Amino acid sequence: MPLEEDVKQDVRKWSELYLEVPNKHLGGMPACPFAKKTWKDNKVLVGVKGKHKWYKTQLNLYLKNIDWNKHELLIFCDPYFNYGIEDLQNAIDEYNKEYNKKDVFFMGFHPDNPANEEEQEFLVTPNGDAPTVDSDVEYSMMLAQKFSLLQEASDTLHKSGYYKLWPRGYYQDVVVSRKKTYRRIFGGQHDG
């Protein structure tokens, strides 16, 4: 099987095993309550960087061509990564600086910085035990989605009490900082 297909299947399995299952640390709610439906409705586009291709050139091509009415999430994977965690974070920050005002939000995952039980147990052991994942593929991921859609979903989850079980520091780093950025760009007050 070609590497591109391996990566796409691995991303799908990651979502199924970690993001979509009822999570004991979150009162039975999945880590990402909207993931299962988004996949089911074919609203996820997984792109894989080609070998000997420039990262930003490839990602920019996906961003230029994505139809946000058809897809709600772009997961851009790089199985040829040769950059560190800080480099990926710098790229995420650059893309957010440029694209947040265009209603697109970026986040990422680097294989050298996986979620850990101490800080993000709910992302590591959704059912109490770490799922067994048979994969020899390593890749970085850059996720892009409509900022307004993400913030609307986050506000809905906040009102339901979903975030009460999140680790406080992780909640501040992810949810509160994102909401402050959204309110700064698009107006309104930070209320959560």
In which residue ranges do the predicted regions lie?
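Expand to "…catalyze enediolate/carbanion chemistry for C-C bond making/breaking, isomerization
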Residues: 1-192
